[in-house]
């Protein structure tokens, strides 16, 4: 092995948390290198959050155009040009990558494109994408290697060469019948988008409900919305076998509670969970331990089992959202500056960008029940919100959990137009530890979706001397 090049900071993976660490460290005067195998800026910029939301927005325009007559606008027949959809998405991604490259140049962090593997503690061998090898060593190492789509072990599935979100976002044709394996957030977003573009869509979910972590009423409402758009949903459906080739013709054998059934389709999209990118990068040589699921073991400060080595983002088992990876960066940054911040107990918010979207922050009813937390529940259908009535976006509902003893907001869920923006107001109130009555008495602008918060929180049941933990319907 050649003599290593010395850096003060070495980052493996240029995703959200990793790039922010690198730019911060480089701006602080530390010699910093970032090793990235493929996607500058990570999956969010290239093949996940940003491009998928770009495509979802195209699908929403298609949907509105097809229903324009309901709003008094007369259109001729609507056609979808998938090549233009892809070009629009690609141009957006290219702009994001250009901004990233500008940030590397401005901060002085060196971006090295290649595949890295640890050969000893805090020493990385990099096989460069354009040929050659470099060996890098650093005082501090940060791991931000992310995850990739899991492929279920099903006879014939691998041979069928199914799509993941990566390939689905590059299609320039419209699948006649898309079969989505998995009823989680990414699968539902893509299922609705392709249905709106014009595909027949079937969702196969092995569990008893869509979005398994959500409360049953939330899952039921989303299933109703998707079914109303013509998406077929199969629950408690075990995929037994796949024949054929995705992109041509596929036949799937599925076992449901009632019987086995055959599903014929044209394309398969696998959206059945994620696997950490921790194999084959020499973490054992670096002294970095993994948990039983292959994620990097970290403490609340995101420190690994190896001294001066941190992990952040999805590979560290953090919630799989870009904003949580960014928060991981802030925790590491502040702790290196002498503070004592932790990931434990942080308030996690997220959105699913279906139409209408789902937004959630804090505890769900199910989580409160499992944790033995007594909570009061307030619920409001979106049809009761004047802004929803005015715009005829009446699907969904709001729901809040309130502490029994102190009137604090414990959790909030919304399916409805602008759910993410409304949720942000509740999230801010929760961070400030405000009583729910603060929102009850707030004069929200009229007629906005957020105005519904006053109605929602006016429906909070009074405290009771004896109350059992909320049961999930």
Regions flagged by a language model, labelled:
Residues 2-7, 24-30, 35-174, 202, ...:
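Glycine-rich flavin
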Residues 3-15, 174-184:
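Beta1/beta-strand and adjacent pyrophosphate-binding region of the FAD-binding site
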Residues 10-12, 116, 124, 135-146, ...:
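Short hydrophobic core segments
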Residues 12-38, 43, 50, 54-61, ...:
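Flexible, glycine-rich terminal cap/loop adjacent to redox cofactors
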Residues 18, 184-187, 325:
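Catalytic nucleophile loop
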Residues 23, 192, 223-224, 366:
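Alpha-helical segments flanking ligand/cofactor-binding loops in enzyme cores
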Residues 49, 143-200, 204, 232-233, ...:
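Glycine-rich dinucleotide-binding loop and its adjacent helix/turn
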Residues 158-174, 262-335:
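FAD-site-proximal beta/loop scaffold in flavoenzymes
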């Amino acid at each position: 092995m050649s003599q290593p090049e010395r850096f003060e900071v070495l980052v493996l993976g240029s995703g959200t948390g990793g790039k922010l660490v690198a730019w911060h460290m480089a701006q602080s005067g530390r010699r910093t290198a970032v090793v990235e195998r493929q996607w500058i800026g990570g999956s969010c910029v290239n093949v996940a959050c940003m491009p998928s939301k770009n495509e979802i927005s195209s699908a929403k325009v298609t949907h509105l155009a097809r229903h324009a007559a309901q709003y008094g606008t007369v259109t001729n027949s609507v056609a979808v040009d998938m090549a233009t959809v892809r070009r629009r998405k690609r141009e957006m991604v290219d702009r994001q990558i250009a901004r990233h490259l500008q940030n590397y140049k401005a901060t002085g962090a060196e971006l090295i494109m290649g595949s890295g593997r640890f050969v000893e503690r805090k020493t990385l061998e990099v096989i460069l994408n354009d040929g050659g090898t470099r060996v890098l060593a650093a005082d501090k190492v940060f791991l931000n290697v992310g995850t990739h789509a899991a492929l279920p072990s099903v006879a014939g599935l691998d041979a069928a060469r199914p799509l993941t979100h990566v390939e689905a976002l590059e299609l320039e044709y419209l699948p006649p019948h898309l079969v989505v394996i998995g009823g989680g957030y990414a699968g539902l977003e893509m299922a609705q988008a392709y249905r709106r573009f014009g595909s027949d869509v079937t969702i196969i979910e092995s569990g008893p409900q869509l979005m398994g972590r959500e409360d049953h009423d939330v899952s039921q409402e989303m299933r109703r919305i998707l079914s109303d758009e013509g998406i077929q949903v199969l629950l408690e459906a075990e995929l037994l076998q796949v024949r054929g080739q995705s992109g041509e013709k596929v036949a799937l054998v599925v076992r449901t509670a009632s019987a086995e059934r055959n599903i014929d389709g044209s394309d398969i999209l696998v959206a059945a969970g994620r696997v950490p990118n921790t194999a084959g990068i020499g973490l054992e040589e670096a002294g970095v331990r993994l948990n039983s699921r292959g994620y990097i073991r970290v403490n609340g400060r995101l420190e690994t089992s190896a001294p001066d080595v941190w992990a952040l983002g999805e590979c560290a088992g953090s919630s799989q959202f870009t904003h949580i990876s960014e928060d991981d960066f802030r925790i590491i940054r502040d702790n290196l500056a002498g503070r004592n911040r932790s990931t434990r107990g942080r308030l996690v918010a997220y959105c699913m960008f279906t139409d209408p979207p789902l937004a959630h922050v804090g505890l769900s009813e199910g989580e409160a029940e499992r944790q033995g937390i007594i909570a009061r529940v307030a619920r409001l259908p979106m049809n009761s919100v004047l802004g929803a009535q005015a715009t005829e976006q009446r699907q969904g509902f709001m729901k809040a959990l309130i502490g029994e003893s102190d009137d604090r907001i414990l959790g909030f869920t919304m399916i409805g137009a602008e759910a993410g923006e409304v949720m942000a107001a509740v999230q801010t109130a929760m961070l400030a530890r405000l009583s729910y009555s603060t929102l009850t008495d707030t004069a929200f602008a009229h007629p906005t979706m957020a105005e519904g918060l006053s109605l929602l929180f006016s429906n909070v049941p009074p405290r009771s001397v004896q109350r059992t933990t909320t049961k999930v319907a």
